Amino acid sequence: MLLLPVLTKAQFSISGVISETSQQVLPGATIRLKGKSFGVTTDSKGKYHLKNLKAGNYTLVVSFIGFQTTERNLELKGDLVENITLKPAEFLADEVIVNATRANDKSATTYKNISKAEIQENNFGQDLPFILNNTPGVVVTSDAGAGVGYTGIRIRGSDASRINVTINGIPYNDSESQGIFWVNMPDFASSIENVQIQRGVGTSTNGAGAFGGSLNIQTTAPSADAYAELNNTYGSFNTLKNTIKLGTGLIDNKWSFDGRLSRIKSDGFIDRAASNLKSYYLSGAYHGKNELLRLNVFSGTEKTYQAWDGIPEARLKGDVQGMIDFSNRQGFTEAQKQHLLNSGNRTYNSFTYKDQTDNYAQNHYQALYAKQFNDKFSFNTALHYTDGKGYFEEFKLDQKLSKYGLPPMNADGAVQKRTDLIRRRWLDNDFYGATYAFNYKAQSNLNFTFGGAYNEYRGKHFGQVIWAKYPSTSNNSDHYYDGKGNKNDFNTYGKVSYSPIEQLSLFADLQYRSVNYKISGTDKNLRSLDFNNTYHFFNPKFGATYFLNEQSNLYTSFSVANKEPNRDDFTNLKVGLPSPKAERLHDVEAGYRYKENRLNLGVNIYGMFYKDQLIFTGEINEFADAYRQNVDKSYRMGFELDASYILSSHFAVNANAAFSKNKIQNYVDYVTQYEDDGTETLITSNYKNTDISFSPKSVIGGELVYKPFKGFAAALQSKFVGKQYLDNTQNDSRKLDAYWVNNLRLGYDFQVKGIKNINLGLLVNNIFNEKYESNGYTYSTAYQNNVTTENFYYAQAGTNFLLSLNFKF
């Protein structure tokens, strides 16, 4: 009895080797304690070590892709050695679909894995960027100000067009703009199994390639048992989310079917910035012992009131005279000026026409197949098709009929050359192709992967005038412009990883990519389009990982990436500037990783050196498409930290930080000067060693989690983002101020008879009511050598809340 207090306070360990039935060890297997949030992975010899454990009863859970998850009940009285042999899985796991393009513990790549549980506890109906906001170097923004509708994400200062997104290994980025439109897939987070974020170039993948990072998404994996879920959220700005999820579980251990139906509505923080979003997800799969066939169909429909004009600086500051001057410069009508003067400082929306909306529907079809031929050779492939169609509608005052290819009209006793009108600008596109990957494990220390993809995109761009004050002889269905964009994208890659000694893992990754992009027809300004460019890219990557011990390793890598210009780089090109060129990136990464029971730590440094980088100039066109221009030499260098530590059974802390220097060696700024005769000339200004636009020097995040009793968790989330310049002149009169925002998340899980789980959740965003802007734009014009600069900002909501009630059956 005297020894009992000593025993209960003692710290013990569990260690051992994880192997398969043939006695071959399994490096990379996951070992965790049931009911605990920490775990470890096996080293190159299949060894694991759980330390600093109190005496007591534990359930050890061991999992590895392709093998059955095993649980072992243990009574811990002293240091324990527990060797475990895993049996092959009775069916092939869905993870094989994404393995070819993912990083792992041996990869010399900077990455972070985000589990289904982490996604779901932060899923209150906001778009995926806001759910991923607590990861290193990430900055998010919302046009409507509250995370629903049009949202954006940047990683290491790079916008969405430089973040390569794949869903089950299939490219998601729009082929022409290279952007990511999460509004087209509302509540997609409810159908995600896990996400891997790779920062920097990362591994070879399918799509246009990463210039800042990659999001590798795997959708829902099968549940062992049948289930039903009903998830509901209501909150500020009349935000409402309803989600129904159903699944059969495994039928005869071979078949599974899953489905989801969602709707999200929100009025938005910005005036009239309402969203009406609907989506569904259906999946059916056959699970053989050595093969997997899965069919996915998912779709999103959105109707979003436009809020992409931003707020003029004078309105944001409440500067009445500045607003009057701005109205005069813009040629506002009296009604438009009064609307500006009488709106809220932080909620102003220039659009007032009731149907000034963006309307789009997108349907995705995926057929995924994987085959494990033996313990050395496996194969997976996918066929996919996406069709999308939609338009945005606009009311326009006093438009020249000639801009729409229309003749003058006789009306009101005079010849009318201008008219008020309503127009629709359409996009109708198709995207289809195939991906594949072969994996050959020659021996325990040597692995080969060969894969690639071929995809085609066909896009139609056209406009219609559906109403005019002075109607012409044209019909509503007539197109006043017609443009096409055709893109063929082929890539193939080979990867090899080799461990010459136990502690060292080397890799080489070689990719060839060929792109043909053809633009034809006329654009929205009735200009002729005729581009037909073919690009050939070679993207090599090399790296090494050295394991210091079971818990820690060092890694370093060198990668090359190339990327073609997007459609807007051609169509937004200013008169007198050269055609856009493809850009190249040399990325150097080095880091240290440490993982044990309670502490998970990653630190890394990076250098990203660009040739001909296409950089935001700070301007946008009338549809919020950003202007970009090539700069000869530029770079991003930085330090990143990602850590989590379990302080006790009640407290845990997560922290991340990114500190960077983002510079352009020589930057030429172009300002358009308008002459009295209607001609345009360019005024140039030269700058040296300026900061790259939208690239904060510091991004710091943290989360303190408190679990006082079973089922309840509270998390205080904090985010600091340093100042960002709106353009590349490093002018303090054109910047976003630094901001520090804190959110509070509460969750309580409990059970009642007949219901497996009930979850009550509360998310209070911006609890200290920080007034901040996360995005903006700027442009300058000149007349008689007098330059005028206009700044616009996207204000984010103050304190707001989302309350959720979720049921699992």
Where are these regions (language model features)?
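A beta-strand signature from Gram-negative outer-membrane beta-barrel systems
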Residues: 84, 186-229
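Transmembrane beta-barrel wall of Gram-negative outer-membrane proteins
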Residues: 234-265, 270-309, 313-318, 367-374, ...
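Gram-negative outer-membrane beta-barrel transporters
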Residues: 607-609, 629-728, 806-808
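Short acidic/polar hinge/loop motifs at secondary-structure boundaries
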Residues: 51-52, 120, 171-199, 218-219, ...
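Short, acidic, small-residue-rich periplasmic hinge/interaction motif at the N-terminus
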Residues: 19-21, 29-34, 63-67, 77-121, ...
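C-terminal beta-signal and adjacent terminal beta-strands/loops
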Residues: 653, 661, 720-725, 748-809
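Membrane-embedded beta-barrel scaffold of Gram-negative outer-membrane proteins
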Residues: 376-384, 545-547, 553-559, 581-637, ...
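Extracytoplasmic beta-strand/coil segments of soluble accessory domains associated
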Residues: 129-171, 193
